[in-house]
Amino acid sequence: MLFRSTPFTAANGYSPAPGYLQGKTVDMVGGGACQASSTLYAAALYANLEIVQRTNHGFASDYIGLGLDATVAEGGPEFEFRNNTDYPIKVCAAYTTSGSKNYLKITILGTKVDDSYVKIKTEVLETIPFTEEIVETDELAPGERKVEQTAYTGYKVKTYRNVYSGDGKLISSTFEASSNYKARNRIVLVGKSTATTPTDPGTTVPTDPGTVTPTDPGVTAPTDPGAAEPPVEMERPGWLDTGKEGEG
């Protein structure tokens, strides 16, 4: 089954929403369509269906777990899965709202032939930190700060599909996908300061050079910001039915 969401036009039912364009977050018609493809991808994984093609986002998504997103765009990439069971399946989608939040629930119905179930193991191989860039501007009051671009931590992730029998015994563990997410720096605009404080040259009192006692800087153990984290195995999570509102 190929997830067909294009063309992203108002005539096709799409409204403007945040999306990614050349590494920037901008409002675009069809922005946020990846929330549907990502939720469908996760549902297909937990239904133990075959994944034909899937591509992760450039940045980690805040509405679904690492390695469980699937990006789609006009002209590609696409998301596609296959019903590799012996019976028909039905994909049901429901969109609901609660207060200011929107929720998407995708359910895949089929024929139960045994009590087996799926867990997805996520292994974070590397974490890539972001930095903060300060940009002075005349468009803000002196000292005023405004976040021009939000930040994303980068990750290198591998996911595995673990299938268990009804009594909890591991039947199979299969490599599912590699997902590489870039880091994006936070950009903060700061209003330029227009006031300068005059300094009094005054009189400088000479200091006695004397004897300088060296200080022991000690030994600092280097830290590895990119150390791998222990693998985490996820059961069918709550957000699979309630994809949060977000970008992409």
Feature-to-residue mapping (PLM):
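Well-ordered beta-sheet/strand-loop patches within structured domains
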Residues: M1-G248
